[in-house]
């Protein structure tokens, strides 16, 4: 089960941190141990570290309208999204 790190910019850090959409979207994909991070020098840059059971399922899910809707709800700026997978 690889650990995945993702970071991106958001419109509102507090809204992003409080949102239930993360668990709603990633939970059914078998993603566990989700931890959130905030850049102390740029609070609109945030990130996640999570354990992913099925990378193919995650990649496919990230290309759906549900992913776009969840990101829009959370104020994620999708053009800034970077995903890194544990080597």
Label for each model-derived stretch:
Residues 1-87:
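Short S/T/G/P-rich N-terminal loop/turn motif that feeds into the first structured element of a domain
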């Amino acid at each position: 089960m690889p650990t995945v790190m993702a970071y991106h910019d958001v419109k509102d850090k507090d809204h992003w941190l409080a949102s239930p959409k993360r668990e709603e979207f990633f939970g059914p994909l078998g993603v566990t141990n989700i931890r959130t991070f905030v850049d102390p020098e740029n609070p609109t840059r945030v990130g996640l570290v999570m354990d992913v059971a099925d990378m193919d399922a995650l990649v496919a899910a990230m290309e759906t309208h549900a992913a776009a809707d969840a990101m829009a709800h959370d104020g994620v700026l999708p053009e800034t999204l970077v995903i890194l997978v544990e080597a």
